[in-house]
A protein has these predicted regions:
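Glycine-rich phosphate/pyrophosphate-binding loop and the adjoining helix
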Residues: 3-4, 78-124
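Helix-loop-strand module that forms the ligand-binding subsite of alpha/beta enzymes
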Residues: 3-85
């Protein structure tokens, strides 16, 4: 099942995660925001969020898009965006399955754990 407005309403915080495609968030993530933006507008203000992006070379385009949406929702950023760079620069590398290095996976785990811990302790 796809995530939707009810999932946002029932969550205490959010970890938005997406690959970056052509300097933007992935189409499925954009679809999620398109379907959810207005149904939850005015109903989730102040909730914490963080962003993770997997990119071939940059990632900042997807981060900017998500942060603008979160600003519209009046969410509270609780960590700098985490960008995992795969350095995929050729068509073959871009289309190939990615192997994320353990240190990058650890950074992702730590961000998720920090968000979960902050929520559990009432920090956010």
């Amino acid at each position: 099942p796809r995530a939707g407005p009810q999932d946002l309403l029932s969550a205490d915080g959010y970890l938005f995660t997406t690959p970056e495609n052509l300097a933007t968030m992935a189409g499925l993530m954009k679809d999620f925001f398109d379907r959810c933006y207005y149904p939850v507008l005015g109903r989730i203000e102040g909730r914490p969020y963080a962003v993770m992006v997997c990119a071939g070379s940059d990632g900042s385009g997807a981060v900017r898009q998500i942060e603008r949406i979160c600003t519209g929702w009046r969410l509270k950023s609780v960590a700098p965006a985490l960008i995992v760079n795969t350095h995929a620069q050729t068509p073959e590398a871009i289309l190939a399955p990615k192997q994320i290095p353990p240190e990058d996976l650890q950074r992702c785990r730590e961000l998720g754990e920090a968000l979960a811990s902050g929520l559990a302790l009432g920090v956010y």
